Amino acid sequence: MILPIVAYGNPVLRKVARDIDENYPDLAKLIEDMWETMYASHGVGLAAPQVNKDIRLFVMDSAQIFANMDDEEKSEGNYPDAPGIKQVFINAHVVEEIGDDWAYNEGCLSIPKIREDIYRAEEVTVSYQDENFKHHTKTFDGVTARIILHEYDHIDGKLFIDKLSPLKRKLLRRKLDDISKGNISVDYKMVFPK
């Protein structure tokens, strides 16, 4: 089932999400719905707070980025994480961010039609559980690391716009206000703050 994406301005997006265990009700269905919602919304990642659940869960698929690149894009870039991954992250915690920060143009399903260059570390080591609650600690790099860090921010109550300068945020204020009021048209289901 495709779930509505929570829009900027909803308090759940600013809440630090809580850990869960294997007894969380209907978790398998929620994960399935999150995958369906993410793909229907043309996203590469989706965190539970974006579907109004304050839990430490996100899904991401960096493989689709590489699958959609043409040969010229592939030859021009340095993509150590190709061909990408498709993964569920439960109770994720960043262990370490490694390497120089690099800019990449990011957007967010909860903040539609706003894209900005955001600086993030080249690599990230994350401790997490998969959908079977098996523990992992892995290091990811490139675009995959970036998506993980973006989604991780969501479960920590942060948004990509928080990384912008105060001046840039001020320049975006009207657009952000429009999003929070529902004065925006998107091609996926959204729910706006009351």
What does each model-found stretch correspond to?
Residues 1-149, 154-194:
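Active-site rim/adjacent substrate-binding subdomains
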